[in-house]
Amino acid sequence: MKVIVCGTTFGQFYMEAIKKFPEKFEFAGIYAGGSDRSKMCANSYGVPLYTNFDDIPNDIDIACIVIRSGALGGKGTEIALKFMERGVNVIQEQPVHYKDIAICVKSAMKNKVFFKTGDLYVHLPEIKRLIDTVKEIEKHQNICLLY
């Protein structure tokens, strides 16, 4: 399956995941603003960097949207919708406002594609450690509130 990653800050986690499964995924490119970081990532992974949405090939199977969602002042949701209109399945990284999720789910159904919000955070070592710690505390006492 051909995969494109949109965004290169947190998107690098997705790039590494794609790289680990070359038998399942073909890293088809990066869609980003053209910063030095995005150029460096494209060069490092040996994939094209697209800065214009219309230049992205039409044979992409999955788009990983790792750009701020509309609720956070970014264009992630807008980009997700554009991909789904093209018939591309979308994984959009959190946080995504529930209204944006509803819009994306409707678009996915209309365009007969899949839409999923990412859950990469729960797999990060620090978050796993926090979850394990909270579970251990819960064995000994009830937790009323976490800050």
Q: Locations of the language-model features?
A:
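General small-molecule cofactor/ligand-binding pocket signal
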Residues: 28, 50, 116
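Beta-loop-alpha module in the N-terminal Rossmann-like domain of NAD(P)-dependent dehydrogenases
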Residues: 48-107
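Short catalytic-loop micro-motif centered on adjacent basic/acidic residues
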Residues: 5, 90-93, 115-118
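A contiguous active-site-proximal alpha/beta segment in oxidoreductase catalytic domains
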Residues: 97-146
